Amino acid sequence: MKINNLEELETPCLILDKNILEKNCLRARQRCIQLNTILRPHIKTSKSIEIAKIALDQEIGPITVSTLQEAEYFASAGFKDILYAVSIIPRKLTRLNFIQQKYNCLVRLVLD
């Protein structure tokens, strides 16, 4: 979408240069290959399936999220390996289990 006047945009919104995004993502993927590691982008800023796919070279690979709402959104789009990057509290475990069962995915946890 091309916008001539930034004041016309509904906020909050994400504004980015797709060419720069693609170059940065390519550089990150190449660096991970050099280090023999897996890229697991944190998608909390973009909250975008399209951007997650650009980051992962159009693959449905591992991602990192900050909310269970984000986890469910990406699970519904076919992402199967999701890291929930904040400490979980017991009352959220039911929803986490629901997401895993409904979308046949794995939501990994970080415990502190």
Q: Locations of the language-model features?
A:
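N-proximal short alpha-helices
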Residues: 1, 5, 24-28, 69
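Generic N-terminal amphipathic, Lys/Arg-enriched alpha-helix
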Residues: 1-16
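A generic structural signal for short, solvent-exposed coil/turn residues
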Residues: 8, 31-33, 101
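Short acidic/polar alpha-helix capping motifs at helix-coil junctions
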Residues: 13-19, 32-38, 56-62, 82-84
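Generic preference for hydrophobic/aromatic residues in regular secondary structure cores
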Residues: 14, 25, 105-107
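Short, well-ordered alpha-helical scaffold segments within catalytic/effector domains
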Residues: 18-25, 68, 93
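N-terminal glycine-rich anion-binding loops that anchor highly charged ligand groups
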Residues: 20-51
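Active-site-proximal beta-alpha core segment in soluble small-molecule metabolic enzymes
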Residues: 42-112
